[in-house]
Amino acid sequence: MSGDVVVFAASSLTDAFKELASEFQKAHPSARAVFSFGGSSQLAIQLINGARADVFASADQDQMDVVQRGRGLAGGQQVFVRNRLMVIAPRDNPAGITSLQDLAKPGIKVVSAQASVPIGYYTAQLLKSASGHADFGGDFQRRVERNVVSREDTVRQIVAKIQLGEADAAVVYVTDVTPRIADQFVRISLPEDLQVTATYPIAVGNGRNPAGGEAFVAFVESPPAQAILARWGFLPPTDGA
């Protein structure tokens, strides 16, 4: 197996997959992983409109299913990691955000994602669940959404908005605040009974290097690669893994 392996991957996988690429090349010296990172929904649209990728790694099941229905996959798909959510605020935290409830306070500037983007879907799921709890109130989701000042196309864009102080708070993946930038944020955990688990499926695409795609998917599922993903904060594909 040799040549470029084109990998379309969710933006939340950027740092982990870049590290994986180095290890993948050590295992396959004649191959090279070439990445296109972006919002899973954007990547799915590209794939069903004719873009060629040897691997597609999505941040949610729906976008993978879209590509499968559009005949953009060469084989089956499987979940390879999971993720969780948290609230972040800028380091100086001018709005005094300390909990999920604070996102509904009048005047709070919240940045979120488009509804078609996985983090947007997961955030809506979280807010809907919270609205069913007496501590939050039945109109909690509506009050938070009223505070949304910007909807981004990727979770990395959301993180950048908070990092630049352009908004007071956002819901992102736990893995998005990497060690390199951790000191620039306040991180706030979610109540465990409201926590949303994001599942990430991966599959071989209809690219020009199917052998390379199969090799990359197999590597991502291997124990060494799973250990790298865990170091970046991702959870194993199942609770028992």
Model regions: which residues?
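Exported/periplasmic ABC-transporter solute-binding proteins
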Residues: 1-28, 32-37, 41, 45-49, ...
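Active-site surface patch of divalent metal-dependent phosphodiester/phosphate bond hydrolases
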Residues: 72
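Short beta-strand->alpha-helix junction loop in the catalytic core
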Residues: 84
